[in-house]
Amino acid sequence: MKPEIIVVTAAYGHQKVAELGGQQALLPIIAEAGADGVEIRRELLSEAELQSLSQLADAIAEHQLEANYSVPDALYVANGLVNPQLDRYLQEAEQMGARLLKLSLGDWRPGAVMPLATRNVKLVVENDQTEYGTLEAIDAFFSQRQPLPGMTFDMGNWLWTGDDAVTAAHRLAHHVSYIHVKAAIPHGDSWRAIALDEADDSWRALLNLLPGTMPRGIEFPLQGDDLVAVTRHYVDLLREE
């Protein structure tokens, strides 16, 4: 069974998304490129769009795409408290017809309350680029003996936290329910995401350590004069990899 390929709208760049008229304008490109779904980013939605998510849901359905919803916020806020905005984010995900809501972990503490989505929306936690997204923190969270959210394994973010991605894959693969495919190179004192064709083959080896049937999200730069062709190239590459 080949994995679903999801296109993250942010892969086109914030400026390009704005130039095209917002994330809804990307749906024809993503659908024509043969992708299975789209990841909608909350930070790229205007206030007006947040008030009309059902229209976005209709457009996604018209293009026969699945939807994931990414929110640039954490599951836990200070001192291990569940984010008070969680229910709002779940409602937004439901309104746009998303099947999962992706958050970072945040300031989780052992013994903290474990929220699980009660709607038809799956909750997933991603390793982000902060101190809360280190392998030590993520591994501790997913080592709990209780029902847990799924994991979004971001292949590139381990570079930002100074962790070894291969070690992370060996430890966490059985928790992974969504993969963000990303390659990066050094950039000043940090890292910069690059297209897979510009990267070495280490991303292939890492991807092969992760569950082969889980959805793969394109979260590296998609740029060029023909966005459909560029997107299709990577959709096909990741589907066959």
Question: Language model features by range: what are they?
Answer:
Residues 39, 68-69, 102, 124, ...:
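Conserved beta-strand positions in the central sheet of alpha/beta enzyme cores
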Residues 54-60, 113-116, 232-238:
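Short, aromatic/basic amphipathic alpha-helical patches
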Residues 1-33, 46, 97, 135-150, ...:
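Histidine-acidic metal/acid-base catalytic patches
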Residues 1-80, 87, 94:
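N-terminal pre-domain/capping segments
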Residues 59-67, 71-150, 160:
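Active-site acidic/histidine proton-transfer and metal-coordination neighborhood
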Residues 11-13, 42-44, 73-75, 105-109, ...:
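Active-site-proximal loop/turn and secondary-structure-junction residues that shape catalytic pockets
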